[in-house]
């Protein structure tokens, strides 16, 4: 039996050696004791280390080339856009590193980014991959769901809430995150003339977004929705949040063409027509975005514009097979878990790519096309003992013919008949 009372007066802190009567509290563990003073000291050490970790979050900031290399692992093509993004993001976080005790009289301003390109060209994927590369919180918002205050719809502060949620409500982390706002072209003013009527989802939303783009301390409802009196709000500084705005900007090539056409008056009036759409987008200027319907103040807060090209068949084929998370690799792995080999012929890959172009969905539509071709196979294969290999041909994609099924001896098990 323990004689606790007899030994109690001799108890000491195992760390500092002080007797129990020299400290306020002595906490017993398994054969050891720690006093309140040592607990406080440990707490201070841990807090300092955590603070140092936070302050050094971007000390290992990758160079533009390293950012580009990481983007290349997941995003095929779009070399100019990737290079522009790599430099812009590097400069943004280098600017954040510069802030603080060593800040001098030169103030480096934030440069938000606009990505202009057709649906399925990789705008969202680029933004997502950037956030993963830098290990920062990331949120996506759709500009079409936003309305100015006082109207039915989402307040712009709800965008910030998504970022805060992505950061697990760590405000310091959220304040260094990335927000991607898609469909930004859909909030363009309907004409260059200021309307006397209310433009609920146009200029008013641009004005609301302008505040968080340029940097402000925003009040965010923790549960989302509209603000209410007496509601507790989360305060977040948007100064160091990087905003990437994406949009297809359908028809902006005509705006650019008109501007270029004005410069060639006196020559052939159709001279501007020699530019194809992609070459025209490389000529984009702030005044073109203003003509399209973005207000000058908004354009001024997004100084970097990167153009994404329309993806052709070869680019889409590469997207299907080359990235680390390529769709063909994903579906191959899925069937591999059922001990079945999956193969796509070159003609099948071309057919998938051509169908995506035909549907005008770009890379975004590739998964649904493959899913359509494989749905029956993924349903039947887990309960089939004979099938060890599945071959997807162009006929599977174009004519809805069943994939070729083979057994372990290489024998064809079906006649590739048209699916019911």
UniProtKB/Swiss-Prot annotation:
GO annotation terms (biological process): cell division; proteolysis involved in protein catabolic process
Keywords for the protein's UniProt record, in alphabetical order: ATP-binding, Chaperone, Metal-binding, Nucleotide-binding, Zinc
Function summary: ATP-dependent specificity component of the Clp protease. It directs the protease to specific substrates. Can perform chaperone functions in the absence of ClpP.
Subunit architecture: Component of the ClpX-ClpP complex. Forms a hexameric ring that, in the presence of ATP, binds to fourteen ClpP subunits assembled into a disk-like structure with a central cavity, resembling the structure of eukaryotic proteasomes.
Keyword Isomerase: no
Matches recorded under HAMAP family: ClpX (MF_00175)
InterPro entries in the record: AAA+_ATPase (IPR003593), ATP-dep_Clp_protease_ClpX (IPR050052), ATPase_AAA_core (IPR003959), Clp_ATPase_C (IPR019489), Clp_protease_ATP-bd_su_ClpX (IPR004487), ClpX_bact (IPR046425), P-loop_NTPase (IPR027417), Znf_CppX_C4 (IPR010603)
Entry similarity comment: Belongs to the ClpX chaperone family.
Listed GO CC annotations: HslUV protease complex
Gene Ontology molecular function: any one: ATP-dependent protein folding chaperone
A Pfam family reported for this protein in Swiss-Prot or TrEMBL: ClpB_D2-small
Annotated binding of ATP, by residue: 118-125
Annotated positions binding Zn(2+): 13, 16, 35, 38
Residue ranges annotated for the ClpX-type ZB domain, each copy included: 1-54
Protein name stated in the entry: ATP-dependent Clp protease ATP-binding subunit ClpX
The keyword Acetylation is assigned to this record: no
């Amino acid at each position: 039996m323990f004689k606790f009372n007899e030994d109690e007066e001799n108890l000491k802190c195992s760390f500092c050696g002080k007797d129990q009567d020299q400290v306020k509290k002595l906490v017993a563990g398994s054969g050891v004791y720690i006093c309140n003073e040592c607990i406080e000291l440990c707490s201070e050490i841990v807090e300092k280390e955590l603070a140092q970790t936070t302050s050094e979050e971007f000390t290992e900031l990758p160079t533009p080339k390293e950012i580009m290399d990481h983007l290349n692992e997941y995003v095929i093509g779009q070399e100019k856009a990737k290079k522009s993004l790599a430099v812009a993001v590097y400069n943004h976080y280098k600017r954040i590193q510069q802030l603080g005790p060593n800040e001098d009289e030169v103030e480096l301003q934030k440069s938000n980014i606009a990505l202009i390109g057709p649906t399925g060209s990789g705008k969202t994927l680029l933004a997502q991959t950037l956030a993963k590369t830098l290990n920062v919180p990331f949120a996506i918002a759709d500009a079409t769901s936003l309305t100015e205050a006082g109207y039915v719809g989402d307040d712009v502060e709800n965008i910030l809430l998504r970022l805060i949620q992505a950061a697990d409500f760590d405000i310091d982390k959220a304040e260094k995150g990335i927000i991607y706002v898609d469909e930004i072209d859909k909030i363009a003013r309907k004409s260059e003339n200021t309307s006397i009527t209310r433009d609920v989802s146009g200029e008013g939303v641009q004005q609301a977004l302008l505040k968080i783009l340029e940097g402000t301390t925003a009040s965010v409802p923790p549960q989302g929705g509209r603000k209410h009196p007496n509601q507790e709000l989360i305060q977040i500084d948007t100064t160091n949040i990087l905003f990437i705005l994406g949009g297809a900007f359908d028809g902006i090539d005509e705006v650019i063409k008109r501007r270029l056409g004005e410069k060639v008056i006196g020559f052939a009036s159709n001279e501007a027509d020699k530019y194809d759409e992609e070459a025209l987008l490389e000529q984009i200027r702030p005044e073109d975005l203003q003509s399209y319907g973005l207000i000058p103040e908004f354009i001024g807060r997004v100084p970097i514009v990167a153009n994404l090209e329309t993806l052709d068949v070869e680019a889409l084929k590469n997207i299907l097979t080359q990235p680390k998370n390529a769709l063909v690799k994903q579906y191959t792995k899925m069937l591999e878990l059922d001990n079945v080999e999956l193969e796509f012929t070159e003609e099948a890959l071309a057919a998938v790519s051509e169908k995506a172009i035909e549907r005008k969905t770009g890379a975004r539509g590739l998964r649904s096309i493959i899913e359509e071709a494989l749905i029956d196979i993924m349903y039947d294969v887990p309960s089939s003992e004979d099938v060890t290999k599945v071959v997807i041909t162009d006929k599977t994609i174009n004519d809805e013919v069943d994939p070729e099924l083979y057994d372990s001896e290489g024998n064809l098990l079906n006649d590739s008949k048209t699916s019911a």
